[in-house]
């Protein structure tokens, strides 16, 4: 990875601002869309806005703001089911930019029994993906290329109610303490099969991270060869896991079998649009605290296998994390500071969407504003250089996050 590449791209993007935040908005089970999950009658414990959590000691780290409030519905799954999480910046439209391409970082998934997890306890990591040196890609690049979707496989756990917690850590301001941005939601599931793989004791959230952990206080703008994914190891009893190359073949077989049972065909050697270059912000202390930058991502194509779902045109096939091979390690114990866990593989099992474009467009703040002079929920409504609407739609107010970025959020 070249520092000069990032520097040149940073200069090109310095004047571009984009609302870059994201939330989980829907879930798929074995390729079947479960509908919008972040609504009043949904199944996702959703926050009032798509803004990140930055204080790793906050109770909002558990399930985000309002995460202690149960959702109306609970989805039913069984061991071996493939669950797909679908992230979006604004809405589920095909034009949605998912998250700003400048927001590089890992994607992880935790699970916990509902009662314990709601209190921040017994969280077990079942999947993770980080940085791939061979392709110079982050998990977030792959997520964007796959239209916000990534998979896990439900472990063979005892029947009961569980929370699944997908998480993104955006490191575009990770070069300063407190700059990393955490995005997460808790999705409510009922496991109907009665497996024998008891979850380990897990970790506490908050508590699992500190602001100075190597993978949280991390400068993506300087040269590096590896990235230590924060948090515990992936539980060796999970069916999802990390993207380590040593186990990608096993994951591919597991995922293919699970998806083939519910989808009619397999499309081989598809090309996935994936980011090969990052667009970053100025790394001065002032700009790092206030500026969010995004620009078009140059993509590179790689042949992978895709399990094609027979649902809707929106059912792009998501990233699948490979099965972890770290069975000799104690599950879900915090790693030491010196430990470097590298997610780098050219043989990663990725379930990817059919190619639609070689470029993933980033939406500028002004371009994303709604027509008619009124900004929609979560859109930009003010700040330095803003030329779009400054009035928010009914039910939302314009909140100042920093001098550069004001956003429409739900009225309190």
From Swiss-Prot:
This is AA9 family lytic polysaccharide monooxygenase A. InterPro entries: AA9 (IPR049892), AA9_LPMO (IPR005103), CBD_sf (IPR035971), Cellulose-bd_dom_fun (IPR000254). Lignocellulose is the most abundant polymeric composite on Earth and is a recalcitrant but promising renewable substrate for industrial biotechnology applications. Together with cellobiose dehydrogenases (CDHs) an enzymatic system capable of oxidative cellulose cleavage is formed, which increases the efficiency of cellulases and put LPMOs at focus of biofuel research. Its cofactor is Cu(2+). Keywords: Carbohydrate metabolism, Cellulose degradation, Copper, Disulfide bond, Glycoprotein, Metal-binding, Monooxygenase, Oxidoreductase, Polysaccharide degradation, Secreted, Signal. The keyword Glycoprotein applies. Binds 1 copper ion per subunit. Has a modular structure: an endo-beta-1,4-glucanase catalytic module at the N-terminus, a linker rich in serines and threonines, and a C-terminal carbohydrate-binding module (CBM). The CBM domain is essential for binding to and subsequent oxidative degradation of polysaccharide substrate. Disulfide bonds join 63-186. O2 binds at residue 172. Its EC number is 1.14.99.56. GO terms for biological process: cellulose catabolic process. The keyword Cell membrane does not apply. SUPFAM superfamilies: Cellulose-binding domain. It comes from Aspergillus niger (strain ATCC MYA-4892 / CBS 513.88 / FGSC A1513). Lytic polysaccharide monooxygenase (LPMO) that depolymerizes crystalline and amorphous polysaccharides via the oxidation of scissile alpha- or beta-(1-4)-glycosidic bonds, yielding C4 oxidation products. Catalysis by LPMOs requires the reduction of the active-site copper from Cu(II) to Cu(I) by a reducing agent and H(2)O(2) or O(2) as a cosubstrate. It is an enzyme of class 1 (oxidoreductase). Belongs to the polysaccharide monooxygenase AA9 family. GO terms for cellular component: extracellular region. It catalyses: [(1->4)-beta-D-glucosyl]n+m + reduced acceptor + O2 = 4-dehydro-beta-D-glucosyl-[(1->4)-beta-D-glucosyl]n-1 + [(1->4)-beta-D-glucosyl]m + acceptor + H2O. Cu(2+) binds at residues 21, 103, 183. Residues 1-20 form the signal peptide.
